[in-house]
Each structure stands twice: as C-alpha cells, then as structure tokens.
Amino acid sequence: MHNNKVEASANSSMQNSAETRLETGQDHTEQAITPTSLGLAGLVTLITTSCGGGSGGGSTGSTSSAFSSTSSSSSAVSSGSSASSLNASSGSTASFTSASSASSSSVAPVPDYTPAEAARFLLQAQFTATDQEIAAVKAVGYESWLNAQFNAPIDQTGAQWLTANGHATPKDDGNYFNPVFGDWMAWNQLFTGTGQVRKRLSLALSEFFVVSLSPIDGFWPPMLIAGYWDLLNAKVFSNFRNLLEDISLNPAMGFFLNTKGNLKEDTASGRQPDENYAREIMQLFSIGLYELNLDGTPKTNAQGNPIETYVQSDITNLARVFTGYDWDYSKVTQQPGFESYPVPSPEFTSGRMKFDANKHSKLAVSFLGTNIPANTSGAEALRIALDTLFNHANTGPFFCKQMIQRLVTSNPSPAYVQRVASAFNNNGSGVRGDLKAVWRAILTDTEARGASTSTSGKLREPIVRLTQIARTFNVSSSNGKWEIYDLSNADWGLGQAPLRSPSVFNFFRPGYVPPNTVLAQQALLAPEFQLHNETSTAGYINFISNFIKDGYSDVKPSIAALEPLALNINALVDWLNLHLTANQLSAATLELIKTALKTPNLTSASSATAKNNRLYAAILLVVACPEYLIQK
C-alpha cells in the first residue's frame, strides 16, 4: 500500500509540522525541480515546506500565523473548463430555481459571483465544488441553493446500505459482532450519494454529539452506529430540541454513555444512577462548563473568573432523569448465527430505547434552578430536563461557535458568533433552535463570505480532505463492498475516521491551541491541529499518494476526466486550484507546482502512464500544500 513512502526522519523539513512551517515564514529559494530528480515524495516535501503563509509563498521574516495564507484569484478557471465533466454525479441533485426566475422583478437579482467565490462557499457547505455545482450556486445564489439542499430527500441510509449488502443478517462468520462493516458503511455514506450538504453537516454534528464505534461491542455494532448516523442525517435540518431528545434516547448513545440499563438508586446496596450521560449532555451537548454571553465570550464574576454553569449536585440530580431506559427487544426475533448460536435480529438498533417505569428513579430532581417533583413520570421528567437545557442562555452560543469552527473558521469573531446564536434563539419567526436557520446564518454570514484575513480559516480535517478527493475524482468500488477500514492510525492512515472518535471529547477540543507556536502567542484557536504532528504529516502524504494512484482496497478514484489536461500544465494546475482550493493557492505556489510538473517533458506521443503520473503528481502537490490544508 505504501510505496513511495515519505519517512518523517528522511528530511529535516518534514520533521516540522505543517503548522510550524506555515507560521515561521521561512525563506525557501525557488529552484527548478522535477519528478525525476526528486521523486514524488521529495517533491511533496519541497512543496509542503515552500508554499507557506502570506502573499509571497513563505516570505522571509513573515510573522503570519498558520492561518495567514490569503485566497488568491490568480489564474482563475471558468466553470466551463475542458474538465467540466469531472464528477458530474457527485454533487447534490436537488432542484433549484432557474437563473431567469431568480432575477425576475419580484426577486432580488442574484449577485454575479465569481467561480472562486462559489467554490469557496461550496467547500464550506459540503465536500466538493464541481463545475456543475459552481454553476448552480452562481445561477441562484447562496440562500436559494441552500434551501434546495435543505429540501432534498435522503437517498440510501446507512442501515439500508448494510441491509442491502448482507450485513444485517447473521452469518456463520459472526458478522453481527464485527464493527468493520460500520467503517465500510460510514465511508460509503460520505463518498457516495446525493445530499452532500446533509452529510457534511451531519459529520459536523457527529463531532459535537459524539458517539464512537470503537467501544461498541456485543450484537450489531455496525447497525447501531448506522442507526445513529441515520438519525443525524434525518434530523440535521430539524430543531435542536428534537435532536437533543432523539440522541438522548438513541440505542448507540445509550451504550456509549451508559443510559442503556441505567437503574434507579437502591438504598440497600448503595447503588446510585450512572452519571455519565447527565454530565456529558450538559458539558458537551448543550451548555458547556462556563456561562457565556450571546457572543460566546465567557461571563466573569467580580474577581474576573469564569462562572461555572453547573456543580456536582446538578449532575447527581439530572442522572435520575436518565434511568429506566434500555434497548427495545420487542420486535426482535432470534436467528441462528455462528454454530447455530441464537442471535437477536437488529431491529433494536434503530428508533428509541424503551422505558421501564419500575427501573426509573421516583426521587425529586433539582438542577440548574429547575425542580422536577418526586414521582413525576419518566416522559415528563425527560421533557422538563431537556427543555431546561434547550432554553438555557448558553446553548445557542455554545453550539453555534463550534459549528462555525467545523465549517468556516477556528476563530470566529464574537460578532459572528452572536449573529449565529441570535438565529438559534429566533429564526425570524419566533422559533428557537431551528437548525436550518443556524446553518444558513453560518454559511451566509459576512465573515464567511467576505475576504479572508490573517486569522481566518481552519485546518481541513483529514476526513474532509479524503472525502473531497474521493468525490471530486469520481471514486468507485470495484465490488460494491467499499472496504475502507478504520483509518485513525496516523502512521499509515489519516489519524481520523468517521464515527471513530477516541472518546466523547471528539478527535480534538474546540479550545485547543498548539503549544509553543505563533498561534499560541497570538491566542488563536486551532482545534484540528490537535491531530497534526510529524507522524500524521508523513502518514497523510503516504496515504493520499497511494490512494490517488492505486486506491484503497476495492475503492479507487478516477482521473479519466482530467486526461485532456495532461499536456496543458497551466490549465491542469489552475483547474485543481479552483476545484480543490477555491483559488486559494498563491501565485508563487502555483508557479512552483507548474515548474515541478514540466519535467519530464510530455508530448502527445508520450505514454499514457507518463501522462497519468503527471496528473497524480499534480493532485498530490496541491492537496499536500499548506495553502490547501488551511481552508479559508
């Protein structure tokens, strides 16, 4: 799998993380380089240490941070380029208003977005920016295009895919215990189908309301995680309050955070309700640790210290609400599995957990100033508790800031957070928690659509990078199995995989600051950099290099639609710049990549292998460059 391997110790420049290289602004003398003279790995090492922040591609004395590369519109390619057929089917297929109707007398005219502006919006809202998608956004504008995606139907769900591929029926090989089919399902969901916006935003939700496949054992881990993923997809455009209730009663969440089988107190044994979910629903899923202003900044007491949102007694009391729940086996049938061992059918993995009043605490509950009387029914206690969290002043800014971080920028201004949190509090029609209003506010805000700054942007997550590459280059499975496993290992994988968080705290913390960096000196957040180090840098380049050329297992992208550009280096690199980075690469970086691709010289008589190698190298050089990795 890992030919052309880049060793972290092979070159001193590779020993520095991409973040460090970006912020030091070290000077690299540009020189003529070729795939022949350096090899592909050497080329990538040079590119990743040469294309840096600022407008000069790594100018001497730069004090810019890792976010300092600015968007460039140089060498823009029109949406009608010769590779326009690439990935025609990967984007959303929701219908949209025609340009003529959008510009009618009763509707404001659509702004004349450039292809780069449309691509930038698309790469924040979903995974790809194909020519068809760019044209659609330009035709109707951001909001109308988003509305079409909000109304687009769900195609195949994760559970449906598992069922269709035989992963929901017990087999002699013990498939009902095997979690890897959950990985196959997750990658298939990200790589295929329509409704990219739904899936991109569901991925963001999965890193806020975290459930991980890794600790789930027993019967049907793949179906359990599929049920959770399908829930997020189904409710991503609904209301936060409804979503909060659905995830609280979801079977996978019940297993992950111990509400499954959570019993009421027992005075004889001293048993108390498990407090895990009660803690995490406050700390991570709703209000956070400290009181916030509407703009996401912390409130402070007279001594200037942050004010805690809850104390231990709040957790202990709230835990009583989440007792009496367990998986619902009422529709399950026993089926023969390995050596005829009885296996329950997977109906319990979707829907909600069942409630048993006999196992539910009848004690009074007092938390966050709310009192639930003793002997309140389980359903009513749950309603009061979730309403309390939903209506808390913290919930809007706490949730919205993290969604901005996932989609647009690691360091949103307080004003940006306040505008989005205000949309959470009131969608304009008096409705609180309308997620469509939140997504619309995030993606159309002036801070998202305006010019990038030295502190805007974020590091693209490895999952997002791979999904973008896969969809942009029409990935397919040779046998329909989509056998992509857990890629969380940074040595040979990506250091990240969907629905495989190492803990309930996600792959990275929203407040993470890389220590001993310019980012730390400037007090800038960079959550995704918690995944980034020397090992992950080399691992990413190794993995992507092999994936682009050889695929992974039965899964492989196609460069067929790029082949007409193999002999036109300028058009090739400019096409990649627009569709992969929204013209974010600087002129210096573009020139460096184009120079590298000139040798060996190719003609129409050159072999198909030589032409394809140029295409592989071009893609890799773009997606290995820090100006791509930092999405503006």
Which stretches of residues belong to each language-model region?
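N-terminal mature-domain "stem" immediately C-terminal to a signal peptide or N-terminal signal-anchor/transmembrane
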Residues: 107-155
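Flexible, low-complexity segments enriched for small/polar residues
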Residues: 119-126, 209, 392-396, 400-429, ...
